[in-house]
Design a protein with these regions (language model features):
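Class I SAM-dependent methyltransferase Rossmann-like catalytic core
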Residues: 2-33
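Conserved alpha-helix/loop element of class I SAM-dependent methyltransferases that forms part
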Residues: 26-46, 61
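Class I SAM-dependent methyltransferase SAM/SAH-binding core
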Residues: 47-102
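Conserved Class I S-adenosyl-L-methionine
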Residues: 57, 171, 186-260
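A short acidic, Gly/Pro-enriched loop at the edge of an enzyme's catalytic core
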Residues: 100-111
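A short SAM/SAH-binding and catalytic strip from SAM-dependent methyltransferases
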Residues: 110-123
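A short glycine-rich, Lys/Arg-flanked "PGG" loop and its adjoining helix->strand segment in the class I
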Residues: 125-137
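Conserved catalytic/acceptor-binding region of the Class I
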Residues: 138-202, 212-223
């Protein structure tokens, strides 16, 4: 949720990643399944929305629980929506939209879910305000997002090379709680969990980040290509952090629920 991330960069990055996204999105699937395990669909809820649906993994899970209720799948990147529609051509209403400016009616939804998407929104007050607008009274917002403990190893390795920001910055659970309260949400529930993923080489991690569209999108990132020498030095610094031959990356996941 870096305020410095430009929407056009997000749209372009995730649109380009759509075709190969599923092959590198194992973490996203694990987190999405845990999100629903923690905050399942209410049998009494109205229409359900998957905000930042990507290629539709969470959309499919929600569709299986919807019991004939309307399901909306929204994403800022049209190629992602097209990939989701190819999986779930019936029973879902697809909308290409910015999460901070939802083209939905007031109080028309019972629940909003979002899996590892809202961290790319620059304006938390606008995001939480518009989600609250489109939910009916008592409606639930439930989402998983990256926390500041994400990719700490990669941050530390790049810090040995230069002073630029090479890794996306994410806000804390405390900041999210404050922003939800300021927007009028109540009964907030935030749980932090750290996932670890392993790679044969640092280059494999970098390819995965690019494959899911989550490479460095900060506006204050270094402009121009990274040199081979810089990349070599970063890889050496990353490897020096590891106690054995494994390359490990940490991902802090914040599971958040609040009610209108």
């Amino acid at each position: 949720m870096s305020a410095a991330i430009a929407k056009r960069d997000i749209r372009r990055s995730f649109g380009a990643a759509a075709a190969g996204y599923d092959s590198v999105a194992a973490l996203q699937r694990r987190v999405g399944a845990e999100l629903l395990a923690r905050f399942d669909v209410s049998p009494a809820a109205g229409a359900i929305a998957d905000l930042g649906c990507g290629t539709g993994f969470l959309t499919g899970l929600l569709l299986g629980r919807a019991a004939d209720r309307p399901v909306y799948a929204l994403d800022i990147a049209l190629p992602m929506l097209q990939a989701a529609r190819a999986k779930w051509p019936a029973g879902v209403r697809y909308v290409c939209a910015d999460a901070e400016r939802l083209p939905l009616a007031d109080a028309g939804l019972g629940q909003i879910y979002s899996n590892l998407a809202l961290q790319w929104c620059a304006d938390l007050p606008a995001l939480f305000g518009d989600c609250r607008r489109v939910l009916a009274p008592g409606g639930q917002l439930a989402f998983a997002t990256f926390g500041p403990g994400t990719l700490v190893e990669l941050k530390a390795a790049w810090a040995e090379v230069d002073d630029y920001r090479h890794v996306n910055a994410f806000v804390s659970g405390a900041e999210i709680r404050d922003q939800l309260a300021a927007a009028g949400w109540h009964d907030g529930d935030i749980v932090s969990r750290t996932y670890s993923t392993e790679y044969a080489a640092v280059a494999d991690l970098m390819r995965e980040l690019k494959g899911i569209g989550a490479h460095n999108l900060n506006a204050d990132r270094k402009r121009g290509p990274t040199t081979r020498l810089q990349l070599r030095d970063m890889i050496a610094a990353y490897q020096a952090l590891m106690p054995d031959a494994r390359i490990v990356a940490s991902w802090e996941i914040l599971f958040v629920r609040a009610f209108r």
